């Protein structure tokens, strides 16, 4: 999921709950 690192970083700033999903 290294390619998702940037996506996750931007998403976690908007919705930290996404990481839990």
Curated annotation (Swiss-Prot):
It is an enzyme of class 3 (hydrolase). It catalyses: a nitrile + 2 H2O = a carboxylate + NH4(+). Its EC number is 3.5.5.1. Keywords: Hydrolase. GO terms for molecular function: nitrilase activity. Belongs to the carbon-nitrogen hydrolase superfamily. Nitrilase family. Acts on many kinds of nitrile compounds such as aliphatic, aromatic, and heterocyclic mononitriles or dinitriles. Prefers S-(-)-2-(4'-isobutylphenyl)-propionitrile to R-(+)-2-(4'-isobutylphenyl)-propionitrile as the substrate. This is Nitrilase. It comes from Acinetobacter sp. (strain AK226).
